[in-house]
Amino acid sequence: MKLFYKPGACSLASHITLRESGKDFTLVSVDLMKKRLENGDDYFAVNPKGQVPALLLDDGTLLTEGVAIMQYLADSVPDRQLLAPVNSISRYKTIEWLNYIATELHKGFTPLFRPDTPEEYKPTVRAQLEKKLQYVNEALKDEHWICGQRFTIADAYLFTVLRWAYAVKLNLEGLEHIAAFMQRMAERPEVQDALSAEGLK
């Protein structure tokens, strides 16, 4: 299978999940500004949405949207326990976090990355994100991972988005549980491999 990605983008969560799954895959970098692949091909021909991630399965099926890709990968390797079984409350708590990260955190950063966002609007965006990160920090207070004592795909997504918080220099002072979580994630070999493959540190 092939993962279409942009270094450091939200596709990093799917990349980490792929490495945690133990599956064989190849990486294809996408220039999202030009919508071109490494070889110059039109990315819209692969994914009409023009966004990453996209996962091309061996049978030719294309999956898009990171949350869907991560759940598919987790369910394909149940022995890895990246997502709890159907009908377990643990599974739905993980999905709850995936949705929160996608809608409240991930999309919350978008105005900070868009060059056309008015400068006077950015302090409000930053303040909203910092308030939400306080909630995340509190959720990690007594837990090793965001859903408890076992690593899940929600951790891969949370790690990816939290990296942006550091990149745009949000005020993370006093959020020691987030800092500890980021350190635990950085120590995972699969995370290290994903970051290295994307040329990140």
Curated annotation (Swiss-Prot):
What is the recorded phenotype of mutating residue 10 to A? 8-fold decrease in affinity for GSH, but 5-fold increase in GSH transferase activity. Loss of thiol:disulfide oxidoreductase activity
Q: What is the effect of changing residue 106 to A?
A: Decrease in affinity for GSH while nearly no effect on affinity for CDNB, and decrease in GSH transferase activity
Q: Which residues form a coiled coil?
A: none
* Cellular component, GO, one term: cytoplasm
Task: Answer yes or no on keyword Transferase.
Answer: yes
Q: Please tell me, according to the UniProt entry, what happens when changing residue 10 to S.
A: 6-fold decrease in affinity for GSH, and decrease in GSH transferase activity. Loss of thiol:disulfide oxidoreductase activity
Thermal dependence: Optimum temperature is 35 degrees Celsius.
Keyword Cytoplasm applies: yes
> Where this protein primarily resides, as one coarse class?
cytoplasm
UniProt record, GO biological process: response to hydrogen peroxide
Activity dependence on pH, as recorded: Optimum pH is 7.5.
Please give the catalytic activity noted in the UniProt record.
RX + glutathione = an S-substituted glutathione + a halide anion + H(+)
Residue stretches making up the GST C-terminal domain: 87-201
Sorted UniProt keywords: Cytoplasm, Transferase
Q: Which residues bind glutathione?
A: 10, 35, 52, 65-66, 99, 103-106
Please summarize what the entry says happens upon disruption of the gene: Deletion of the gstA gene decreases the resistance of the bacteria to hydrogen peroxide.
As recorded in UniProt, its EC number(s) are: 2.5.1.18
Classification via CDD domains:
GST_C_Beta (cd03188), GST_N_Beta (cd03057)
**Which NCBIfam families does UniProt cross-reference here?**
PRK10542.1 (NF007831)
Protein's job: Catalyzes the conjugation of reduced glutathione (GSH) to a wide number of exogenous and endogenous hydrophobic electrophiles. Shows activity toward 1-chloro-2,4-dinitrobenzene (CDNB) and ethacrynic acid. Also possesses thiol:disulfide oxidoreductase activity, using GSH to reduce bis-(2-hydroxyethyl) disulfide (HEDS). Has a low level of glutathione-dependent peroxidase activity toward cumene hydroperoxide. Is important for defense against oxidative stress, probably via its peroxidase activity.
What family does this belong to?
A: Belongs to the GST superfamily. Beta family.
Which PANTHER family does this one have? GLUTATHIONE S-TRANSFERASE GSTA (PTHR44051:SF8), GLUTATHIONE S-TRANSFERASE-RELATED (PTHR44051)
Assembly state and interactors? Homodimer.
Task: Please give the name of this protein.
Answer: Glutathione S-transferase GstA
